[in-house]
Each structure stands twice: as structure tokens, then as C-alpha cells.
């Protein structure tokens, strides 16, 4: 007997059974099941994959080029600054080397002239007008027996070590500001004259004395008579 010949009640029962089976199967299906989604996922085409790889390579190449350009510009700037500084140093070095001897020569009094300034031994019984009770350079009192150097013309006295150090960098008296240039020039001029006189050899005059020729015999009066 075929299914078309089944009674209506049997067909209705069959339809109900199939409907309940389908609904139960749908209820058991998880919409968030990854395994089921994998079945329905569509595999990407090879053309899309190739385009994505090409874009990534282009971006990487551009980033490398930009980094290289930035590094080259920075290195060029550093080399340029270093070259400018070296050129300025080379230009200023000969000027400073030429100017330093003049400044150093005019900086203070020469030791040769300084040694010619008189030195006295201090005592409280001294009545020199230029010597006080203390050294104005180190601000310490004079003690009996200390060696003091007196400056010419103003006659101010100071400790030898103090005034020697002062006059290595100054040309004036630390107390009255009297200039010592003329005095030092005079002293150095006398020294240069003395040195020139000592260095020039004395001219020796050689006098040659020839022996006298023998004269003839002279007859005296007695012999003639």
C-alpha cells in the first residue's frame, strides 16, 4: 500500500513527527559554534592574498626609504656643523697665537727688572715713610726679620713673595697705583747697554816695531886728529 493510500490520520501524524524532529534539530544547533561557521566560511581567493602581500611590501619599502632619508639628512647636518666649527677654530687659532705674545709681554714686570728693586729686613725701629705695619696684598702684619721689597719712587714696602706675584700680572703699585713702566724700561735699558758692552769684543791695536838698520861708523874728533 502506497503513502497516498494511507488514511488522513496517518499522514497527519507523520507530518507532526517530522515537524517536531526538525524543530528539535534546530534547537540543538548552536549559532556561535565555530565548527559550524568553518563549514560556511568562504576561502579567500588567491588574487586578494597577492594584493595584500603587495601592499605590505610597498609600505615596508616606503618606511625604509623614509628612515634612510632622515638618517642621511641628520648625518649631513652633523658633518656640516663639525666642519664649520673646525674652520672657525683654524681661523681664530693663528690670530690668538699672534696676540698672546704681545699680551703676555705687556702683562707684568720682567723678573730681571723686578730683582733690581731693593729688599730690606723689616724691624719696628725703621722710619721709612713708605713702609706701614701690614702688607696691603695679603693683609698680614709685618714681623721683625721679614724680607720686604721696596718699590722705586713711592718706596712702598710689601712681602717679597706677595709683591713679586702681584707684579707678574700688574704694572702699578698695589697701594698708590704708581706706574712702574718707565722705571723698568730704564733698568732694562741699562742692562741692555751693559750686556752690549760686555758682549762687544775690545779691538786690539797691534803696533809693529821694525828693528833699526845698523848705521855707519862715525869718526869722532879725536880719531880725525
Swiss-Prot record:
Keyword presence, Transmembrane: yes
Membrane-protein topology: Single-pass membrane protein
Keywords attached to this entry: Membrane, Metal-binding, Transferase, Transmembrane, Transmembrane helix, Ubl conjugation pathway, Zinc, Zinc-finger
Pathway where it operates: Protein modification; protein ubiquitination
TM region(s), chain numbering: 59-79
Pfam families the record matches: zf-RING_2
Tagged with keyword Nuclease: no
InterPro entries tied to this protein: ATL10/ATL72-79-like, Znf_RING, Znf_RING/FYVE/PHD
Subcellular location, principal: membrane
Disulfide bonds: none
GO cellular-component term (any): membrane
Localisation per UniProt entry: Membrane
EC number: 2.3.2.27
Enzyme class per UniProt: transferase
GO terms, molecular function: ubiquitin-protein transferase activity; zinc ion binding
Residue intervals of every RING-type zinc finger in the record: 135-177
Physiological role: E3 ubiquitin-protein ligase able to catalyze polyubiquitination with ubiquitin-conjugating enzyme E2 UBC8 in vitro.
Notes concerning its domains: The RING-type zinc finger domain mediates binding to an E2 ubiquitin-conjugating enzyme.
Family that this chain belongs to: Belongs to the RING-type zinc finger family. ATL subfamily.
UniProt-recorded name of the protein: E3 ubiquitin-protein ligase ATL76
Organism of this sequence: Arabidopsis thaliana
Organism phylogeny: Eukaryota, Viridiplantae, Streptophyta, Embryophyta, Tracheophyta
Amino acid at each position: 500500500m502506497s503513502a497516498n493510500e494511507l488514511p488522513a490520520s496517518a499522514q497527519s501524524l507523520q507530518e507532526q513527527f517530522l515537524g517536531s524532529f526538525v524543530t528539535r534539530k534546530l534547537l540543538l544547533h548552536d549559532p556561535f559554534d565555530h565548527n559550524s561557521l568553518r563549514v560556511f566560511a568562504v576561502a579567500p581567493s588567491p588574487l586578494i592574498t597577492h594584493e595584500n602581500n603587495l601592499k605590505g611590501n610597498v609600505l615596508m619599502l616606503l618606511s625604509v626609504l623614509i628612515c634612510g632619508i632622515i638618517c642621511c639628512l641628520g648625518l649631513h647636518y652633523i658633518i656640516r656643523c663639525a666642519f664649520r666649527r673646525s674652520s672657525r677654530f683654524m681661523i681664530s687659532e693663528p690670530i690668538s697665537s699672534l696676540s698672546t705674545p704681545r699680551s703676555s709681554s705687556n702683562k707684568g714686570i720682567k723678573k730681571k727688572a723686578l730683582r733690581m728693586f731693593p729688599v730690606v729686613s723689616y724691624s719696628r725701629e725703621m722710619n721709612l715713610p713708605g713702609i706701614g705695619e701690614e702688607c696691603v696684598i695679603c693683609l698680614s702684619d709685618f714681623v721683625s726679620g721679614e724680607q720686604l721689597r721696596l718699590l722705586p719712587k713711592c718706596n712702598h714696602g710689601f712681602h717679597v713673595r706677595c709683591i713679586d706675584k702681584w707684579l707678574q700680572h700688574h704694572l702699578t703699585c698695589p697701594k698708590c697705583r704708581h706706574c712702574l713702566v718707565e722705571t723698568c724700561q730704564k733698568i732694562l735699558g741699562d742692562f741692555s747697554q751693559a750686556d752690549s758692552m760686555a758682549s762687544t769684543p775690545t779691538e786690539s791695536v797691534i803696533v809693529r816695531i821694525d828693528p833699526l838698520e845698523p848705521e855707519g861708523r862715525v869718526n869722532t874728533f879725536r880719531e880725525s886728529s
